[in-house]
């Protein structure tokens, strides 16, 4: 994958979050994670959707965590989750449920979904956006997932399902409700995200 400042920044960001979490758990030497992440990035197929670049980089970093740390996927997931929860920058970047679910953003979302179907990057996400209805305020159907793709490319498709859990954590931090009944990572035909304001 081509190098970019944003991709480099996201890699450094995830490492800065996880490093103190590893230290808390008595894992002192994790320098190899950075090296392995760089190796994965070099091999990675293109993913040129700026909205989901951080997720793609996170997928690579999670693979590196599992190859180097000596901990289980569940333990590494907890390290990543705890690091994100404790990050003021991450929480600020998420914003509020009210802002996220604002219908004024729908036009841009429809354009984003249409653009995703052009599959400009081999490991891009592909999705549909669903408008507000009686059951939810915003829906997404994802038919292809960049995290699933990079995990499959790296020979560890079983790791993708752990990162799916972060979607619920992020919704909770925004004070939004997320309902999802199936995921690509667990073999479904698509992921069905349904967001609502907590009432």
What do these predicted regions represent?
Residues 20-30, 41-48, 109-111, 126-136, ...:
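Phosphate-binding glycine-rich loops and adjacent basic patches that engage nucleotide phosphates
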Residues 195-199:
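Short beta-strand-to-coil "C-cap" segments at the C-terminal boundary of structured domains/repeats
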Residues 57, 61-63, 67-153:
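Amphipathic interaction/junction segments at domain boundaries or subunit interfaces
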Residues 28, 72-75, 157, 177:
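Short coil/loop linkers at secondary-structure junctions
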Residues 1-67:
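N-terminal, charged low-complexity regulatory/assembly segments
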Residues 126-186:
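Short, hydrophobic/π-rich interface segment
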Residues 186-194:
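Beta-rich nucleic-acid/ligand-interaction surfaces
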């Amino acid at each position: 994958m081509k190098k970019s400042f944003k991709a480099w920044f996201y890699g450094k960001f995830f490492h800065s979050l996880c490093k103190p979490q590893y230290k808390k758990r008595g894992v002192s030497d994790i320098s190899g994670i950075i090296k392995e992440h760089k190796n994965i990035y070099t091999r990675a197929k293109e993913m040129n959707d700026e909205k989901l670049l951080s997720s793609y980089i996170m997928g690579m970093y999670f693979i590196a965590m599992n190859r180097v740390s000596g901990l289980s996927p569940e333990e590494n997931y907890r390290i990543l989750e705890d690091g994100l929860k404790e990050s003021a920058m991450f929480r600020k970047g998420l914003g509020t449920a009210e802002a996220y679910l604002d219908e004024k953003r729908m036009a841009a979302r429809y354009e984003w979904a249409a653009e995703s179907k052009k599959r400009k990057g081999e490991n891009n996400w592909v999705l549909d956006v669903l408008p507000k209805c009686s059951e939810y305020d915003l829906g997404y159907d994802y038919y292809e997932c960049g995290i699933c793709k990079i995990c499959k490319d790296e020979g560890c498709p079983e790791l993708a399902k752990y990162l799916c859990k972060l979607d619920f954590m992020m919704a909770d931090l925004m004070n939004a409700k997320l309902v999802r009944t199936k995921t690509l990572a667990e073999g479904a035909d698509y992921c069905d995200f349904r967001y609502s304001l907590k009432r």
